[in-house]
């Protein structure tokens, strides 16, 4: 039966992060605890006037392989794993009972975050001995106290002071749980590194090409920060990030000013960055409630912003504005004089622009960098499961399209069609976009009927005073019936871009021809659920 309170007589200390260890060691000595320490910890404490027994002295064997093997020894693990049943065995082998293990591991995660670091340096930061110590001690929680979290040092000291140098069973069990969690997270970080970085996703690319996904999929994220609340005020939330962070993403972004990002801010900013980075030409995207409400290209970012804003100024109020070019002082002044804005995002924020924005200190300003890579995987959590798919990174080019109508679209119609097609995958299905001259005129999203999205997008455009004559229309999926074609024709739409693939394609094409319109097939559906 476990001891309710365990007197601590001997503690093994092996820590990479030595924060707080001096104060804890002093408290242990106050309670007459014998200290056994590994070389780095031994030297650190000795310099501060605390004497201990080195592991090498205790086991009568030097550290070997440049310190890679220090504590992997029967006298260490025999002392940690022993219980009341094997006291005599340990006594005959001159193995002392170790009542406490204080350890933390090599800083693997910090090394991984550094760019261009060699694999050899990463390997040297994979802890073996510390992990073994923590697991041995956690396994034997009935007879050993294990501490892996520097934030628990004060709790440990307080408990020992209160209980004359002893630790309660409840605390030992809690600390063992933390140790297993720490070890688990550490191993996942290592796995993710080898899976994502060392193999540089070659195997993943090959497997995805062959439509193969791993039998076991494991992910590990680290908490960056708590956010004020979740999607709604009554929900709690936190923001976690990938072990490796790339430019052109929200986690990579530097917040130059403004209040703390909310849950919804992060979601909307991610969509805004992803959408605007699809374009090689100068572009601006305005997002509201996870949906682009205005997107435009232009000869400069002010021109692009102006057109995006006037696509739907009502929805743009309090929205997220994202650019794929540096934010200039002229653009910053134009925006703050035009509308109330929640967030402004650009790959670079020029100094003068930031000085101008400081007059509106509540505006969140994110400098996100330029997108450096396409991400291979996309996943969505469902209750008790995870859906995994390869990311939709396909960018439509003119050589990929198929013109299926009698009327041939003009060069400008093709360019505008491809432009709005790049946006459609960021609009919730059923999605319809009207556009012209590389800008959106009206967006219909999230309707369970395609004809309703077609109508909503048109009414939005008309409400802003736009004429749809000579405009283009994009649909994220095929048209099951001709009703949307006939509706668009009434407003003068001249070209439609859609995936095709309906059993009624022939009827749809006939409707297009009857209305003297052009139709482009992309052969790629762009659902967003």
From Swiss-Prot:
Domain of life of the native organism: Bacteria
GO biological process annotation, one example: 'de novo' IMP biosynthetic process
A GO cellular component annotation in the UniProt record: cytosol
Domain MGS-like span(s) in chain numbering: 1-148
EC numbers: 2.1.2.3, 3.5.4.10
InterPro entries linked: AICAR_Tfase_dup_dom_sf, Cytidine_deaminase-like, MGS-like_dom, MGS-like_dom_sf, PurH-like
GO molecular function, one term: IMP cyclohydrolase activity
Associated pathway: Purine metabolism; IMP biosynthesis via de novo pathway; 5-formamido-1-(5-phospho-D-ribosyl)imidazole-4-carboxamide from 5-amino-1-(5-phospho-D-ribosyl)imidazole-4-carboxamide (10-formyl THF route): step 1/1; Purine metabolism; IMP biosynthesis via de novo pathway; IMP from 5-formamido-1-(5-phospho-D-ribosyl)imidazole-4-carboxamide: step 1/1
Catalytic activity annotation: (6R)-10-formyltetrahydrofolate + 5-amino-1-(5-phospho-beta-D-ribosyl)imidazole-4-carboxamide = 5-formamido-1-(5-phospho-D-ribosyl)imidazole-4-carboxamide + (6S)-5,6,7,8-tetrahydrofolate; IMP + H2O = 5-formamido-1-(5-phospho-D-ribosyl)imidazole-4-carboxamide
This protein's UniProt keywords: Hydrolase, Multifunctional enzyme, Purine biosynthesis, Transferase
Domain notes: The IMP cyclohydrolase activity resides in the N-terminal region.
Protein name: Bifunctional purine biosynthesis protein PurH
Phylogenetic classification of the source organism: Bacteria, Pseudomonadati, Pseudomonadota, Gammaproteobacteria, Enterobacterales
């Amino acid at each position: 039966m476990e001891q309710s309170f365990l007197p601590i007589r001997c503690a093994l200390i092996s820590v990479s992060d030595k924060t707080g260890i001096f104060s804890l060691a002093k408290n242990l000595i106050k309670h007459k605890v014998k200290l056994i320490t590994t070389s780095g910890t031994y030297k650190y404490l000795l310099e501060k006037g605390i004497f201990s027994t080195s592991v090498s002295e205790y086991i009568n064997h030097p550290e070997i392989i440049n310190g890679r093997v220090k504590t992997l020894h029967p006298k260490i693990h025999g002392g940690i794993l022993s219980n009341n049943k094997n006291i005599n065995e340990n006594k005959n082998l001159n193995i002392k009972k170790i009542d406490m293990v204080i350890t933390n591991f090599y800083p693997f995660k910090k090394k991984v975050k550094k760019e261009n670091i060699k694999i050899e340096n990463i390997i040297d930061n994979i802890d073996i001995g510390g992990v073994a110590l923590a697991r041995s001690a956690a396994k034997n929680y009935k007879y050993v106290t294990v501490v892996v979290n520097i934030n628990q040092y004060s709790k440990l000291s307080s408990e020992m002071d209160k209980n004359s140098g002893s630790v309660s069973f409840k605390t030992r069990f809690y600390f063992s749980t933390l140790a297993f969690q720490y070890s688990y997270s550490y191993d996942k970080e290592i796995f993710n590194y080898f899976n994502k970085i060392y193999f540089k996703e070659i195997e993943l690319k090959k497997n995805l090409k062959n439509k193969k996904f791993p039998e076991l999929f494991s992910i590990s994220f680290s908490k960056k920060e708590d956010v004020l609340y979740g999607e709604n005020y009554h929900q709690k939330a936190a923001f976690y990030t990938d072990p490796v962070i790339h430019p052109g993403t929200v986690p990579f972004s530097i917040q130059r000013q403004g209040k703390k990002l909310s849950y919804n801010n992060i979601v909307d900013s991610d969509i805004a960055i992803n959408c605007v980075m699809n374009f090689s030409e100068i572009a601006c995207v305005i997002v509201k409630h996870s949906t682009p409400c205005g997107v435009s290209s232009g000869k400069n970012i002010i021109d692009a912003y102006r057109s995006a804003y006037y696509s739907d100024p009502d929805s743009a109020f309090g929205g997220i504005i994202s650019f794929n070019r540096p934010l200039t002082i002229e653009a910053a002044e134009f925006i703050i004089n035009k509308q109330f804005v929640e967030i402004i995002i650009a790959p670079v924020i020029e100094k003068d622009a930031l000085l101008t924005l400081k007059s509106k200190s509540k505006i969140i300003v994110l400098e996100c960098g330029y997108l450096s890579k396409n991400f291979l995987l996309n996943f969505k959590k469902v209750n008790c499961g995870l859906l995994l798919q390869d990311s939709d990174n396909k960018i439509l080019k003119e050589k990929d399209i198929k013109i299926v109508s009698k009327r041939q679209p003009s060069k400008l119609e093709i360019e505008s069609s491809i432009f709005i097609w790049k946006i459609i995958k960021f609009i919730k299905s059923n999605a319809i976009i009207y556009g012209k001259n590389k800008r959106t005129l009206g967006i219909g999203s999230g309707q369970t009927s395609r004809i309703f999205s077609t109508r909503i997008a048109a009414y939005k455009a008309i409400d802003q005073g736009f004429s749809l004559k000579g405009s283009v229309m994009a649909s994220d999926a095929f048209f099951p019936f001709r009703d949307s074609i006939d509706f668009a024709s009434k407003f003068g739409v001249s070209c439609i871009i859609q995936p095709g693939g309906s059993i009624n394609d022939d009827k749809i094409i006939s409707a297009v021809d009857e209305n003297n319109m052009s139709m482009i097939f992309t052969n790629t559906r762009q659902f967003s659920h």
